[in-house]
């Protein structure tokens, strides 16, 4: 559903299940994250997503649409099995334990585009690179013509429980490194700040599958 005041979209049916994964109410978490998503949206004008996982499924908790005339328009496309093909999914996968990764990736890796990494060995190299760099990208791996940047949100045990990603038409960033850097810096800042809030309000950090 859409909150008409904030213009954000939410998956209402997912909130209860997300609350069972973390140690405080999902509404509280999403409400706190909202202004940070809005800030990214204001700075970049691009679509912004707050994501997490439900078992082995990737779920979108909140989304802000792009404000640009030419924009990414994918709404709530089904990303349940797209952990390996999205910046939001890979940003979490790269920092999970090996056991959690294997559980999520045990099935067939669906190929969404010609750029989707659906080979486990190649994906492993990609996740190692993400772990080293601290962020993930999706270069037309989920949707043709779309480039995304995603950062993990960590709990007080440095385990990823959510992620923020920003999506842009690829042509806008191909020859504009400054624009890409602006996207990365705004998403990184928000992911860190939201993580700080989680660490202050949650001292258990052991209920999720990271």
PLM regions: where:
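Beta-hairpin "wing" of winged helix-turn-helix
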Residues: 1-5, 10
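Amphipathic alpha-helical effector-binding/dimerization core
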Residues: 10-105
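Short, basic/aromatic recognition patches
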Residues: 32-41, 105-150, 189, 197
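Short clusters of small/polar residues that mark proteolytic maturation junctions
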Residues: 63-65, 141, 165
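Sensor-regulatory modules in signal-transduction proteins
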Residues: 153-156
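Juxtadomain coupling helices with adjacent low-complexity linkers
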Residues: 161-210
């Amino acid at each position: 559903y859409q909150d008409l005041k904030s213009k954000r979209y939410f998956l209402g049916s997912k909130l209860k299940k997300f609350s069972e994964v973390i140690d405080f109410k999902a509404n509280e978490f999403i409400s706190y994250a909202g202004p940070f998503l809005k800030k990214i949206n204001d700075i970049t004008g691009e679509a912004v997503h707050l994501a997490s996982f439900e078992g082995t499924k990737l779920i979108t908790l909140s989304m802000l649409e792009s404000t640009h005339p030419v924009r990414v328009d994918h709404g709530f496309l089904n990303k349940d099995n797209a952990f390996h093909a999205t910046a939001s999914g890979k940003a979490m996968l790269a920092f999970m334990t090996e056991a959690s990764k294997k559980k999520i990736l045990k099935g067939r890796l669906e190929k969404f585009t010609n750029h989707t990494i659906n080979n486990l060995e190649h994906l492993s190299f990609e996740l190692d690179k993400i772990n080293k760099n601290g962020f993930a990208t999706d270069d037309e791996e989920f949707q043709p013509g779309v480039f995304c940047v995603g950062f993990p949100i960590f709990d007080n045990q440095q385990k990823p429980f959510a992620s923020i990603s920003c999506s842009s038409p690829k042509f806008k960033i191909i020859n504009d490194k400054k624009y890409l850097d602006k996207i990365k810096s705004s998403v990184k800042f928000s992911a860190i700040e939201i993580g700080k809030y989680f660490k202050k309000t949650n001292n258990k950090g052991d209920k999720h599958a990271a």
